[in-house]
Amino acid sequence: MSDNIYSVSQLNSAARQMLEGNFSQIWLTGEISNFTQPVSGHWYLTLKDENAQVRCAMFRMKNLRVAFRPQNGMQVLVRANVSLYEPRGDYQLIIDSMHPAGEGLLQQQFEALKMKLAAEGLFAQNLKKTLPHFSKAVGIITSSTGAALQDILHILARRDPSLKVVIYPTAVQGKEATAEIVQMIELANARQEVDVLIVGRGGGSLEDLWCFNEEEVARAIFRSTLPIISAVGHETDVTIADFVADLRAPTPSAAAELVSRNQDELLQQLRHQQQRLDMAFDRLFTRKSQRLKQLALRLQNQHPQNQLRAQQAKNEQLTHRLQLAILRQFENTQQKFTALSVRLKQNPLPYRIQRYQQGLEQLKVRLNFCVNRQVTERQNKLATLCGKLDGLSPLKVLARGYSIAENPQGKAIVSVKDVNQGDFITTQVADGKIVSKVL
C-alpha cells in the first residue's frame, strides 16, 4: 500500500491544481449542447464532438462580451482554462472567450498579431501623437458611399462649419481594402493638408472589419506623422487598428466629436476671456492714471520756480536771525559796559578807579575783538548764503538756457492746458522777454 493516503477532498484539490497548472488558456472547438442561462446570468453548456464531451461554464462578466447568442448545435471556438469542481469531482472548462467556429481562425490570427505588434512596441502609449487642440483641417479615410462618412460630415457641419474636410475614399471591406487604406494613409501624410486623420467605417461582422486587423494597415498607422483616430464599427468592436492608433473612438460619430469644437462653446469661452481682458485693462488703466497724477504732483512741487521761492524764504529767515543775534550781542555788551561804568563811579578810591579803568580798557579790547569776530563770522555765513541764493537766482537759471513762460495774468505756465489758442504769452530768457501768440 502507498504511504500517501488521500482523502476525497485532497484528491480532488490535487487534481484541480494539476489540471489548472497544465491546461491554462487552451483553444477548443466543439458543438454546443445542454445550453442554459439561470437568473445569475452565467452560461452553462456542454461542448462535444462525435466521441466525447466536456462540461463548461462561462461567467456573466465574460459572456457579456460575446457578440452572439449561443444555441444548441452551434459549432464554436472557445478559449478556456481546464478546472475541476471539487465538491462533485466534475472536470470542466471555464470559458474566457467564445466565437463561432467560422470566426475562430480569424480570432486566433487576431490574437497572434496583437501579441506580435505589442512585443514590437507598436501599442506603446509614450509613442502616441497628441491631437491638435484646434484642428483647421481633418482628413477622413473611409468609404465614400458609407453611412459612417455621412454621420461624420453631419456632426462636423453642425459643430464646426469652418473646419476644412478632406475625404480620402477607399474600400473598407474585401480584398482591395487593405492596400487602399494603406495607400490613403501614405497619401495624406505626403500631402500634409490636414491636421488629423479619421480612419474607420460602420459596424459589421469580424470578417467585414478584418481589413482593420491586417498587419499592413497597422504598420501604416504607426508610420504616420499625422495623428490618427481609429473609428471602426461599434463600441464593442475592437480591431488591431484601435491599439496602434493615437486615439480610439468607439464610433465614427464619436471621432467627429473629438476633432471638432462646438462653436457655441468657443463663443462662450471667447466672451469669458473678453470679460477678463476688459477687467484687467480697467485695473491697469486705473493704476496707471493714479501713478500719472502722483508724478504730475511731484513734478509740480519740484518745479525750479517753486524751489527758488522756498530757498529765498529760507535765506530771508536766516538773514533776520543773524541780524537779531548781532543786535542782542551788542546790547548785552553795552549793558555790561554801563554796569561797570556805574560801579566805577560809585567807588571813590583812586586806585580802584584806575584798576577798573584798566579792566574797562581790557573789556573794550575783548568787546571789540568779540564783536569783530562775530561780525566777521556772520558776514562770511551771509556771504555763503548769498552765494547759494545767487546760484538759485532765476537769472542764473535763465543764463543756463532755461526760460520761464507766463500767461497774460503773469502766472507761470506749467502745462499746455494753462493756455488757449490765441493767447499772448511772455517768455523770460536771460537777456530779455519774448512775447508770443499761441496758434
UniProtKB/Swiss-Prot annotation:
It is found in: Cytoplasm. Coiled coil: none annotated. It holds the Pfam family tRNA_anti_2. Keywords: Cytoplasm, Exonuclease, Hydrolase, Nuclease. It comes from the Bacteria. It is an enzyme of class 3 (hydrolase). GO terms for biological process: DNA catabolic process. GO terms for molecular function: exodeoxyribonuclease VII activity; nucleic acid binding. Its EC number is 3.1.11.6. Bidirectionally degrades single-stranded DNA into large acid-insoluble oligonucleotides, which are then degraded further into small acid-soluble oligonucleotides. Heterooligomer composed of large and small subunits. Belongs to the XseA family. NCBIfam families: xseA (TIGR00237). PANTHER family: EXODEOXYRIBONUCLEASE 7 LARGE SUBUNIT (PTHR30008:SF0). This is Exodeoxyribonuclease 7 large subunit. It comes from Haemophilus influenzae (strain 86-028NP). The gene is xseA.
